[in-house]
């Protein structure tokens, strides 16, 4: 980077810039971008992945919040015809403005860890536009996404991500791959939205409500955590044992509870 464009990572943006060439290459090989792809990179930072993505020949839109990084990115990539830069907050970005076909967007990002979970929920609201997503995240977050029922990692994030997507924990990345090094390990995850949901709920917003309510007090039984939404009899009628704790239920069971609540709301 030239002296003119020196940039320090900003703590308030959760910035840790990827610089390890071996890790960058491994990520690019996992993505396998092709010229016909439509790519969206969130938080390109100083462009560690951007160059390799552009070299694939694919159309690349990037969304960057930090205004001070805009001239750095433009100086490196603005001359390339397949590069399009959007300065703004990815949490507020309207993905429909990209004009992408359904299930065509391939989303990539070394996501700031302080906004990774809300950003993923924002992306899941646009899952119909997305073909796949490859993210660098805190390792602990990836483990929660990929978790199964019965353990401490299984929770709201696991259930709602797995409702929409197939989850693959690809590989881990140590702190030394970044500048400055974060205090935690990182991991690359691949999320592939389902064309047909394996466990479709009547209303996914009701499912979100049930899951959120259940895990607000995850050490209590379902009949206690859900008592404001469903009676003990209604939980049993859903084919669920009300004496279980939320972490003991799989996705299909939560969908049944949500559908019972949806029917209850309609009849009241």
Swiss-Prot record:
Question: What terms describe the molecular function in GO for this protein?
Answer: 16S rRNA (adenine(1518)-N(6)/adenine(1519)-N(6))-dimethyltransferase activity; RNA binding
Write down a Pfam family by its short name.
Answer: RrnaAD
Q: Which SMART domains match?
A: rADc
Q: Which UniProt keywords apply?
A: Cytoplasm, Methyltransferase, RNA-binding, rRNA processing, S-adenosyl-L-methionine, Transferase
Positions contributing to S-adenosyl-L-methionine binding: 16, 18, 43, 64, 89, 110
GO-annotated cellular components: cytosol
Which domain of life does this protein belong to?
A: Bacteria
Q: What is its EC number?
A: 2.1.1.182
Tell me the compartments it is located in: Cytoplasm
Q: Which InterPro entries match?
A: KsgA/Erm, rRNA_Ade_diMease-like_C, rRNA_Ade_Mease_Trfase_CS, rRNA_Ade_methylase_Trfase_N, rRNA_adenine_dimethylase, SAM-dependent_MTases_sf
Sequence intervals crossing the membrane? none
HAMAP family per the record? 16SrRNA_methyltr_A
The main enzyme category here is transferase
The keyword Transferase appears for this protein = yes
* Family label: Belongs to the class I-like SAM-binding methyltransferase superfamily. rRNA adenine N(6)-methyltransferase family. RsmA subfamily.
Reactions the enzyme catalyzes: adenosine(1518)/adenosine(1519) in 16S rRNA + 4 S-adenosyl-L-methionine = N(6)-dimethyladenosine(1518)/N(6)-dimethyladenosine(1519) in 16S rRNA + 4 S-adenosyl-L-homocysteine + 4 H(+)
The protein's job, in short, is: Specifically dimethylates two adjacent adenosines (A1518 and A1519) in the loop of a conserved hairpin near the 3'-end of 16S rRNA in the 30S particle. May play a critical role in biogenesis of 30S subunits.
Where does the UniProt entry say this protein principally localizes? cytoplasm
Please indicate if the UniProt record lists Glycoprotein as a keyword. no
Q: What is the name listed in the Swiss-Prot or TrEMBL entry for this protein?
A: Ribosomal RNA small subunit methyltransferase A
């Amino acid at each position: 980077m030239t002296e003119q464009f020196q940039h320090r990572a900003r703590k308030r943006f959760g910035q840790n810039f990827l610089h390890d060439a071996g890790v960058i290459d491994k990520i690019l090989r996992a993505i396998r971008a092709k010229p016909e792809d439509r790519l969206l990179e969130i938080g390109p930072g100083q462009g560690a992945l951007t160059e390799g993505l552009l070299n694939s020949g694919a159309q690349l839109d990037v969304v960057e919040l930090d205004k001070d990084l805009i001239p750095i990115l433009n100086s490196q990539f603005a001359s390339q015809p397949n590069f399009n830069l959007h300065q703004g907050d990815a949490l507020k970005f309207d993905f429909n403005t990209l004009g992408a076909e359904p299930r065509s967007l391939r989303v990539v990002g070394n996501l700031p860890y302080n906004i990774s979970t809300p950003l993923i929920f924002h992306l899941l609201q646009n899952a119909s536009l997305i073909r796949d997503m490859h993210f660098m995240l805190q390792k602990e977050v990836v483990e929660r996404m990929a978790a199964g029922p019965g353990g401490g990692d299984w929770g709201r994030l696991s259930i709602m991500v797995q409702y929409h997507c197939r989850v693959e924990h690809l590989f881990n990345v140590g702190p030394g791959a970044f500048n400055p090094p974060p205090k935690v390990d990182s991991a690359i995850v691949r999320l592939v939205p389902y064309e047909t949901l394996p466990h479709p709920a009547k209303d996914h917003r009701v499912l979100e409500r049930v899951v959120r309510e259940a895990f607000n007090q995850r050490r209590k039984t379902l009949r206690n955590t859900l008592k404001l939404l469903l009676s003990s009899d209604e939980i049993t009628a859903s084919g669920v044992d009300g004496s279980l704790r939320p972490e003991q239920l799989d996705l299909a069971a939560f969908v049944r509870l949500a559908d019972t609540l949806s029917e209850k709301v309609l009849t009241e």
